[in-house]
């Protein structure tokens, strides 16, 4: 697929170009306001983004602009996005609750 490094080969996601994760909505970027969705400014990581445990997002993460990584993004535990096009939470626009 055309996703982020062909993530699971399921779609264009992450940049809003395809159906993305499990084809629930616009994908890991295409729908639900997208991963570059709502707000102001950019999120830039110039080096490393280490996650040693679990990063949980229980509400909304509004971002507008670019999400850019200049180095590796490493997750030693689990990185879960619940409510943003995840099969267990879904997307508001897909009628599954979640992000909206």
UniProtKB/Swiss-Prot annotation:
Region feature Central domain, mapped onto this chain: 34-81
Cysteine disulfide partners in this protein: none
Source organism, top-level taxon: Eukaryota
KW Lipoprotein (keyword) present: no
Region (Right arm): 82-100
Region named Left arm: 1-33
Keyword set, alphabetical order: Repeat
Residues spanning the membrane: none
Repeat as UniProt keyword: yes
Family: Belongs to the chorion protein family.
UniProt function note: This protein is one of many from the eggshell of the silk moth.
Official protein name in the record: Chorion class A protein M2774
Source organism per UniProt: Bombyx mori
